[in-house]
């Protein structure tokens, strides 16, 4: 659903393991990596969208994960002009996302990328917490930095160090949902 400002509402998903690594997924038939994310349908809650996207993209359901935290507000990014479909109405200029921090509490064999008719990813890997900022497409890097900075205190119990190259000011702090 696109709002009056041209942003599509979206949930982003950060899945962690017991080594505090995150699941990074490779876009189908592309050399492009990102965290799972997806649109919030009309009338759908953030949590409903989270579980639908989690199942469609990664094959996991609520019994496989624990929800740790979320970002408290929408984090926005704009599409580069070449991504904007100017003839489509309403025009979507970017996405606004709320991000959820999850912990995988089941076996990673439950991760299945082919659970939906429209498969989005063809590979995945556990990576260092900060690596998604480097691997994601350039126009998403600032939102990844903002989101990972906001969620890090929850995952690392305030015992984290933000790498020096990430100098953007902290935009928000995570809301703890479960501990």
Curated annotation (Swiss-Prot):
Domain (Nudix hydrolase): residue spans on this chain: 6-149
EC number: 3.6.1.-
Record keyword Hydrolase present: yes
Gene: rppH
Record PROSITE patterns: NUDIX, NUDIX_BOX
HAMAP family for the chain: Nudix_RppH
Name recorded for this polypeptide: RNA pyrophosphohydrolase
Species of provenance: Ruthia magnifica subsp. Calyptogena magnifica
Key words, A-Z: Hydrolase
